Amino acid sequence: LDSITIVSPRYPPYVGGVETHVSQLAKRATKFFRKVSVITTDPLGHLPAVQEVDDYLTIFRIRSLAPRENYHFPSPSGLFKAMRQSHPQVLHLHCIHDVPGPIAGIMRGNSSMIFTPHYVGRLNSGLGRILFGAYRPFISELVEHVPRIICISRFEARLMINTFPGSAGRVEIIPNGIASDLREKNQWREPEEPTILFAGRLERYKNVDKVMRAVAKLREKNDKLRLRIVGRGPIKGELEQLSHTLGLVGSVDWYDRLPQSELFPLYASSTAVVLASEYENWGNTVAEAIGVGVPTIVANTSSLAEFVEEGLAVPVEPPIDDLKLAAKIGEVIDDPKKFSPKGMRSPLIISWDEAAEKTFAPCMSLVNS
């Protein structure tokens, strides 16, 4: 095939789940397309407007407004110019909750389309609810015209079909991949001192405060227990203050957003990874942690329940509170090897090569149709 353009609100060097997803697929798209382009935003204007990467990828970065880094409003003229320059045969749009992908869908011309919505079914800010409510009719029209809608979990697929009934029959499920090289280099071994890891955006719904309270409770009997928190977000300052209140100063290691090359060694050297959020359309950190074999504790709801169903993760039943978390974390740190998923196989744990094959191999029939 000749060309594909992937449109995403953000792209590395920014760090996050969508950024990882898009960059991993873009690297592998050259196996299927002669020309690969990414259109993304650069709110601060500090990065090159056009960047060639190793002769296989062109990145177009458009100035945008980005209130609280949650929503990205690109320059319409900049987006139109990048679309015209990339001239895609296939247009792969990302993020139903943000602006660039759906707007690029308006400008699609004769391009065949793929849509990966990263849909969570709810929004955590007033601006998000207003924005999504305003352009939902347009999104519905876009969804009606996209021949392939790729969701990353059964949970997300159900949300899409319930919200946009017209998408039924065109939704397929392709889980996010795992970096095979990092997985192989960072296989889990039980650490000498018990260490709990959370990695993700620091939002209230992630229940990191409850994880901290659970760790504080467990430290009453085991003062060697430590907590690692990786990420940034609007409640980081609040969580740092909570660490003082709970007497956890010196027992919590704080990390900013980390590249995967630095995150995987943290997985491999932790006693357990915890994601206590009750609402996730996928769990990148969960899949990665399971891939390296670390015991992984999750809220038994939303997409995270799929890992429990596969026997890969340790469940905490909702509603989540610190007492339930403390009980489950305590059970795991008493005998971590008993709960390790090391060596287990599942269709939820795939490589990025497999994810790219499933995503791009059908594009020939898409273009021909």
Predicted regions and their residues:
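An aromatic- and histidine-rich active-site surface loop
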Residues: H46, P76, V90-R122
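Nucleotide-sugar donor phosphate/pyrophosphate-binding loop at the beta->alpha transition
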Residues: S112, R122-L142, S180
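Carbohydrate-associated surface elements
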Residues: F155, G177
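Nucleotide-activated donor-binding/catalytic signature segment of Leloir-type glycosyltransferases, i.e.
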Residues: E240-L258
